[in-house]
Curated annotation (Swiss-Prot):
Keywords carried by this UniProt record: Ribonucleoprotein, Ribosomal protein
Annotated GO MF terms: structural constituent of ribosome
Pfam family, one: Ribosomal_L35p
Entries under PANTHER family matching the protein: 54S RIBOSOMAL PROTEIN BL35M (PTHR33343), LARGE RIBOSOMAL SUBUNIT PROTEIN BL35M (PTHR33343:SF1)
Protein name: Large ribosomal subunit protein bL35
PROSITE patterns: RIBOSOMAL_L35
Keyword check for Ribonucleoprotein: yes
Top-rank lineage group of the source organism: Bacteria
Family in the record: Belongs to the bacterial ribosomal protein bL35 family.
GO CC terms, sorted: cytosolic large ribosomal subunit
Length: 67
């Protein structure tokens, strides 16, 4: 059976947590149009990583067969 291909776009966007049980992602809305957003919003609410929702996790794992 041939090797499964990893979806490169997904590999760049998602990382496994240390235990390998959850998938982490960057938060949205912090790329451009940032002038009207408060520093507090950008620092607290938009910074850091978030976990992929349980309903989406199966699809992400299919895109990352070796993760």
């Amino acid at each position: 059976m041939p090797k499964l291909k990893t979806r490169r776009a997904a590999a760049k966007r998602f990382k496994l947590t240390g235990s390998g049980k959850k998938i982490a992602r960057r938060k949205a809305f912090k790329n451009h149009l940032l002038n009207h957003k408060s520093a507090e919003q950008k620092r607290r609410r938009l910074s850091g990583m978030a976990l992929v929702d349980k309903s989406d996790e199966k699809n992400v794992r299919l895109m990352l067969p070796y993760a």
